[in-house]
């Protein structure tokens, strides 16, 4: 299934983060972590001007609406909620 965002919306795929390990050797499960704040743009709406598909972007941990499609988590956010683009 493909998600096509409308107007100024952007679909972001969460970055895959490795399982975090504490200094004491305890692995922290995903449910105990905060929402990721970095992801890759996979689709953009017709009014999006600043980002393009493939960009890695930063966003606030409470931005947008989280959805799950085919066991993959995505975030649909407004372009204005994107804090910055990570340049390589």
UniProtKB/Swiss-Prot annotation:
Predominant location category: cytoplasm
Cell location: Cytoplasm
Pfam families named in the record: Cpn10
Keywords recorded for this protein, A-Z: Chaperone, Cytoplasm
GO cellular component: cytoplasm
MF GO annotations: ATP binding; metal ion binding; protein folding chaperone; protein-folding chaperone binding; unfolded protein binding
SMART domains: Cpn10
One example of a Gene Ontology biological process annotation: chaperone cofactor-dependent protein refolding
Function statement: Together with the chaperonin GroEL, plays an essential role in assisting protein folding. The GroEL-GroES system forms a nano-cage that allows encapsulation of the non-native substrate proteins and provides a physical environment optimized to promote and accelerate protein folding. GroES binds to the apical surface of the GroEL ring, thereby capping the opening of the GroEL channel.
Record-linked NCBIfam families: PRK00364.2-2
Subunit structure: Heptamer of 7 subunits arranged in a ring. Interacts with the chaperonin GroEL.
Similarity field: Belongs to the GroES chaperonin family.
HAMAP family per UniProt: CH10
Protein name as catalogued: Co-chaperonin GroES
């Amino acid at each position: 299934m493909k998600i096509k965002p409308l107007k100024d919306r952007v679909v972001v795929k969460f970055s895959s983060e490795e399982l975090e390990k504490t200094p004491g050797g305890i692995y922290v499960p995903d449910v105990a972590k905060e929402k990721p704040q970095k992801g890759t743009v996979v689709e953009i709406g017709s009014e999006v001007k600043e980002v393009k598909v493939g960009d890695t972007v930063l966003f606030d941990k409470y931005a947008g609406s989280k959805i799950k499609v085919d066991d993959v988590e995505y975030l649909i956010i407004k372009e204005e909620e994107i804090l910055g683009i990570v340049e390589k």
